[in-house]
Curated annotation (Swiss-Prot):
The lineage of its organism: Eukaryota, Fungi, Dikarya, Ascomycota, Pezizomycotina. Belongs to the DEAD box helicase family. DDX54/DBP10 subfamily. Its main location: nucleus. It holds the Pfam family DBP10CT. The gene is DBP10. Residues 825-837 have a biased composition (Gly residues). This is ATP-dependent RNA helicase DBP10. The Q motif is unique to and characteristic of the DEAD box family of RNA helicases and controls ATP binding and hydrolysis. It comes from Pyricularia oryzae (strain 70-15 / ATCC MYA-4617 / FGSC 8958). Keywords: ATP-binding, Helicase, Hydrolase, Nucleotide-binding, Nucleus, Ribosome biogenesis, RNA-binding, rRNA processing. It comes from the Eukaryota. Residues 657-667 have a biased composition (Acidic residues). InterPro entries: DBP10_C, DDX54/DBP10_DEAD-box_helicase, DEAD/DEAH_box_helicase_dom, DEAD_box_RNA_helicase, Helicase_ATP-bd, Helicase_C-like, P-loop_NTPase, RNA-helicase_DEAD-box_CS. A motif (Q motif) lies at residues 90-118.
Length: 914
């Protein structure tokens, strides 16, 4: 019997009962379709075979089976409507985003939010001010773009921008614009880009199109704000992207002026890779009860990271670096084997090559990043490593942005194995998972070390960090050991078993390899004049760096003297295995004694040790030794210092014993406040007599200590003014993560522009400070006061916008809050989003006039004739032009020509007949 066609149902939720009547025609087909429809879903525990087989027992079984199948299919459709996927909650679907934005996120390839996105997006959607701090490349841009698009939704017909994103550089602004365009494809939001280097007239046109989102650099945006007298009262959403770089590049004045013009009801977000102290003060002033979001709060260093610290001499660091690359990492020379050049680099459709590594994969097996102190170290080490045959990329703060992008892209694609950078440059670079990190110049702060090694051992992968520690770096190593709370293993100490992942393992490198590499480096320096000049500059830069870096603690400095003087300091590192042969150790010890040998004789006494005649100079030196007292050595002075500290300790103990009856202890007070060492200054007297009578001047009844006796500090703190607010919590959290990074070019403070502070005054024939020019005290540069009171350049208000508006015949523009009007013809709607084209780089210039003395005279003459015929450039307003109104210059020129002709002809003009 042939199968009958199914009768149509009114909706997909209704059941076609005719199918159950003819279900026995092809029972196997029905079972196959049922299994296909329900395969792979566990939402309903349904035994389909049992239901279908129930048709043999009675007629009602088929109806129940098919009804159950239809209900299961309907249930699956309703559960998959949100987000168009059947994924579990916990991703972007659980954040309450609109469907068009979810589709854009899925189209972008984001499946699960990154940790910074998971923590910050809910806070931003709740209209909270956020200070986001995360590792580079963790998705900070999407963390503030997604909530911005969710909040703005669509283009507003009311005049006034609603979102402002400040970026430190043109390249970063372009990158942010690209992300905004990709996430806002399902909306009609208008976005404009305002960066330096573009035409001001074009940007005037962009701002008159009523954009919703402004992505700008501080300098150009402040220029447009002053020139156009922009009203920023409609701004609701402000983002400072890479805020640490904004302050480092000297935009503090511009940011202060812009921040003063924003409404107080705005939502302010501040995202940064690091958190300098100046940025903390800016956040306190510009943000309201901010929430600090950071990712390194639970663990300081990844547990999968293994570290090795090598004790080296300052003059042998280049050889030690080559020894690590050759023998420890075993890095091959030349271009990596797996790298292939992209054949279709010129194709616009190809955005990613097939050989480009994934973001969670290492570019190469031996990918290594080397951190140095200054940009001069970067250039010098790059030249040395290139001479050694390695594929090297480099980057530093003063490097051109395009060159930096090319260098980092080569490293990311696997074209090079090594990237030599400074802390300033590496902070804003998106670097994937690395295999190794080498600290060529040891960091002066433990937080900087954590920031450096945080680029490896990501996503559950193993990683190594290698650090070169010289004698002057030993105090900083001990500070790092205390900060990490790890055990210090020096030399061949195998008593408790060294663990490279949980201990600070210190030792020396293999002496033979270092000497070979040092000799090779000296040979390269002698043969290359350029490298020799670089080395001389590096020596000066190293002195300046050591002079300006943060000092280590005094206790670590005392411990470092003992550490460097010990025998274990020069013992081989445990990474090379346990050395049972003491020959190498004895050799190193002998060389150390020879290098530290200091003869007791002077130059006058050399060669006069025999029984012969003694010269007069020798007799004089003997008499001087008898008269002069024996000088104390450095170790004796240290011992005396330690002896002087003993009474102070006794005094502290006596103070503690006298306060034992108090209800609150001073140690508890310090623990509750948790102040940093820089904010507290303790002055202790070394007078032994006062230490003996420490308790004599205290009166137990009337003496007032700086710690409360009868009150609970925790309770008082709970009743404090800032109790219950997020301001105090932000300050406490920011105190732990605040970190200042040393400049890689000059020793200027963070936030100061990196340029010379003095200039030559020709009039007075002397050097004067540039600060006088910037604040307007000198008459060279005219300054005006902004709305916040700071002085800005008077050139910002030059009248160019008024002239542009007059040339384009624009009247009064609508104010903020008014309904937008249609744009004049030819404006094009300028901008980058939501309709409207951008007319850039299409200006047609007329060719130059033909020169009779040039070989191409006839060619030029022909091109000029064509330009006159086509009305191009300056020939646009010739005879027969639609624009017949002449300007003042044309009228003045025509009158002058007419007067000259009249003088030449010597006769009056011809009068018209009536």
């Amino acid at each position: 019997m042939p199968r009958r066609a199914a009768s149509p149902a009114a909706s997909e939720h209704e059941i076609d009962i005719l199918g159950s009547i003819f279900a026995n025609d092809n029972d196997t087909e029905v079972k196959a379709k049922a299994k296909k429809r329900t395969g792979g879903h566990d939402e309903i525990d349904l035994d389909i075979d049992a239901l279908l087989n129930g048709a043999e027992d009675g007629g009602d079984g088929d109806d129940e089976a098919l009804i159950a199948l239809q209900q299961a299919a309907s249930f699956r459709k309703t559960t998959n409507l949100k987000g168009k996927t059947g994924k579990k909650s916990g991703g972007f679907q659980a954040m309450g985003l609109n469907p068009s934005l979810l589709q854009a996120i899925t189209r972008k390839g984001f499946a699960v939010p990154t940790p910074i996105q998971r923590k910050s997006i809910p806070l931003i959607l709740d209209r909270r001010d956020v200070v986001g701090m995360a590792r580079t490349g963790s998705g900070k841009t999407a963390a503030f773009v997604i909530p911005m698009i969710e909040r703005l939704r669509a283009h507003s017909a009311r005049v006034g921008a609603r979102a402002l994103i400040m970026s430190p550089s043109r390249e970063l602004a372009l990158q942010t614009l690209k992300v905004v365009k990709e996430f806002g494809k399902g909306t009609d939001l208008k976005t404009v880009l305002l960066v330096g280097g573009d035409s001001l007239e074009d940007q005037f046109g962009f701002m008159t199109t009523n954009p919703d989102i402004i992505i700008a650099t501080p300098g150009r945006f402040l220029h447009l704000k002053v020139e156009m007298s922009l009203d920023l009262s409609s701004i609701k959403y402000v983002v400072f992207d890479e805020a640490d770089r904004l302050f480092e590049m000297g935009f503090a004045t511009q940011l202060t002026e812009i921040l003063h013009s924003l409404p107080p009801s705005r939502q302010t977000l501040l995202f940064s890779a690091t958190l300098p102290r100046s940025l903390v003060e800016f956040a306190r002033a510009g943000l309201q009860d901010p929430s600090l979001v950071r990712l390194d709060a639970e663990t300081k260093i990844s547990p999968d990271l293994e570290s090795a610290f090598f004790s080296v001499k300052g003059a042998e660091k280049e050889g030690a670096l080559l020894h690590i690359l050759q023998d420890v990492i075993k890095m091959p020379t030349g271009t990596p084997e797996g790298f292939k050049e992209d054949k279709d680099e010129g194709s616009k459709k190809r955005k990613r090559g097939p050989d480009r590594p994934n973001a969670k994969e290492k570019p190469t097996e031996h990918s290594t990043i080397i951190f140095t102190a200054t940009k001069f170290h970067v250039e010098y080490l790059t030249s040395i490593l290139v001479q050694a045959g390695y594929a090297v990329s480099h980057a530093y703060g003063a490097l051109d942005q395009t060159a930096r992008k090319i260098q980092v892209e080569d490293f990311r694609r696997g074209k090079t194995n090594i990237l030599v950078v400074t802390d300033v440059a590496a902070r804003g670079i998106d670097i994937p998972v690395l295999a190794n990190v080498i600290n060529y110049d040891f960091c002066d702060q433990p937080k900087v070390f954590v920031h450096r090694v945080g680029r490896t051992a990501r996503a559950g992968q193993k990683g190594w960090s290698y650090s070169l520690v010289s004698d002057i770096d030993a105090p900083y190593l001990l500070d790092l050991q205390l900060f990490l709370g790890r055990r210090l293993v020096v030399g061949q100490d195998t008593s408790a078993g060294a663990n490279f992942a949980s201990d600070v393992v210190l030792g020396a490198l293999q002496r033979n390899s270092i000497e070979t590499n040092v000799e090779w480096v000296e040979k390269v320096v002698q043969e290359s004049h350029d490298i020799a000049l670089m080395r001389s500059v590096v020596v000066k830069a190293q002195k300046q760096y050591l002079r300006t870096r943060v000092s280590a603690s005094s206790q670590s400095a005392k411990r470092a003297r003992e550490l460097t003087a010990s025998r274990a300091w020069s013992q081989p590192h445990l990474i090379f295995g346990i050395n049972t042969d003491d020959t190498e150790a004895l050799r190193v010890e002998m060389l150390a004694k020879i290098s530290g040998f200091k003869p007791q004789e002077t130059v006058f006494e050399i060669g006069h040790g025999g029984k012969g005649t003694i010269s007069e100079a020798v007799e004089v030196m003997k008499q001087l030794r008898k008269r002069a007292p024996v000088r104390k050595s450095k170790t004796d002075k240290d011992a005396d210092d330690e002896d002087e500290d003993v009474p102070v300790i006794k005094r502290a103990k006596s103070d503690e014993s006298s306060d034992e009856d108090a209800s609150f202890d001073e140690d508890d007070f310090v623990a509750v406040n948790d102040d940093s060492d820089e904010e507290l200054e303790v002055t202790v007297s070394n007078n032994a007599d006062s230490a003996k009578n420490a308790s004599a001047w205290r009166d137990s009844e009337h003496f007032m200590t700086y710690t409360p006796r009868q009150s609970n500090v925790a309770e008082e703190r709970g009743y404090g003014v800032n109790a219950g607010s997020n301001g105090a919590n932000f300050l406490e959290a920011a105190r732990d993560v605040a970190m200042d990074i040393a400049n890689d070019e000059k020793s200027t403070s963070f936030g100061a522009p990196t340029r010379t502070t003095m200039r030559w005054d020709k009039k007075n024939a002397k050097y004067v400070s540039r600060a006088h020019d910037e604040d307007g005290s000198r008459g060279n540069t005219k300054m005006i006061r902004g709305e916040s009171g700071v002085k800005i350049a008077a050139s910002f208000k030059s009248g160019r916008f008024d002239r542009w508006r007059k040339d384009n015949r624009l009247g009064k523009l609508p104010g903020v809050g008014e309904a937008e009007t249609g744009l004049p013809r030819g404006m094009g709607g300028g901008g980058f989003g939501g309709g409207g084209r951008r007319f850039n780089h299409k200006r047609e210039d007329a060719p130059k006039e033909a020169d009779k003395f040039r070989d191409d005279y006839h060619v030029r003459k022909k091109r000029v004739a064509e330009a006159k015929e086509k009305r191009i450039g300056k020939f646009r307003d010739g005879e027969g032009s639609k624009r017949e109104i002449k300007n003042n210059d044309d009228i003045r020129k025509a009158r002058k020509i007419k007067e000259l002709k009249m003088r030449k002809n010597a006769r009056p003009a011809r009068k018209k007949k009536n």
